[in-house]
From Swiss-Prot:
This is Beta-defensin 129. Belongs to the beta-defensin family. Residues 1-19 form the signal peptide. Keywords: Antibiotic, Antimicrobial, Defensin, Disulfide bond, Secreted, Signal. The keyword Signal applies. One of its GO terms (biological process) is defense response to bacterium. Has antibacterial activity. GO terms for cellular component: extracellular region. It comes from the Eukaryota. Residues 144-173 are annotated as: Disordered. It comes from Hylobates lar (Lar gibbon). Disulfide bonds join C27-C53, C34-C48, C38-C54. The gene is DEFB129.
Amino acid sequence: MKLLFPIFASLMLQYKVNTEFIGLRRCLMGFGRCRDHCNVDEKEIQKCKMKKCCVGPKVVKLIKNYLQYGTPNVLNEDVQEMLKSAKNSSAVIQRKHILSVLPQIKSTSFFANTNFVIIPNATPMNSAIISTVTPGQITYTAASTKSNIKESRDSATASPPPAPPPPNTLPTP
């Protein structure tokens, strides 16, 4: 029994394992459930072989908000126009259209246009130079000690402090 449970659990967690025999048939990447009939507050999104893929109102709202606010820069112009015109049509047609568009969306990094500040959590130092990270470029944090500060103050070739990074401009939706 001790060996049977981990094997069964690992099989249940795999993506393509059929779990219909215990009544846990899922659809829409685990957000929906396959049923004969959807409840009053649920919406039918797809077909599960002979059943309907039913999704609750929270999942519908989550998908709608993600498509409206999370991916406006990723979608091409045709899809954006279709989404705008779909607001006037029935909710079922809109959801079916949104779900057909989901596989076409390219994955992008949410943090692609954002600069991060690295703050070291190491031992206490006298001073530290903190640098920003730009996409595709790796920078390292350098720390200076008292002896390095005295040498750089005495030398005539000490470099000026680095210029501040450009202001971060994010597109507004």
